[in-house]
Amino acid sequence: MSLKDNKKGQSVVGGNDSLLLGGGLGRGLLPGSFDPFTLGHADIVKRALELFDELVIAVGYNEQKSGWMPVEERVATIKKLYKDEPRVKVESYTGLTADFARKLGVTAIVRGVRTTADFEYEMQMADVNRRLTGIETILLPASPQLASLSSSIVRELAHFGHDVSKFLP
């Protein structure tokens, strides 16, 4: 698809004036464990909202595992962060992301990638999700200043008694 300008000077995808960048791509799904939700996640949400009319932040959990934070606390924390953003919905789910995406009727799955290893893994997952549901995945590269930040690093720092507040929104 090509990007070109419409009569209003706004970029459009493929010449379709209904797909203005800055919203218009329908409903996106940002899945993750968000254990905890970091500044990196918040940056991906901000950038995804430039593309989608609505974004569902899907907090995934495995019933067989206990997370660092209970899933209910993760959902409540993220809801509180976005309480003034009506385009953000927060839900928890278990099972395959592709199945949850299909259930919600999303336009695309959004994933942040920090490294080439993340990219390769996410490309494989995107292919599987597309084959299962026909739903595409949009990969957003991490902002350079946040590329080294991950939930697992934050958990490890907290485990050793470090203040992690500067990594959290």
Where are these regions (language model features)?
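Nucleotidyltransferase catalytic core that binds NTPs
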Residues: S2-P169
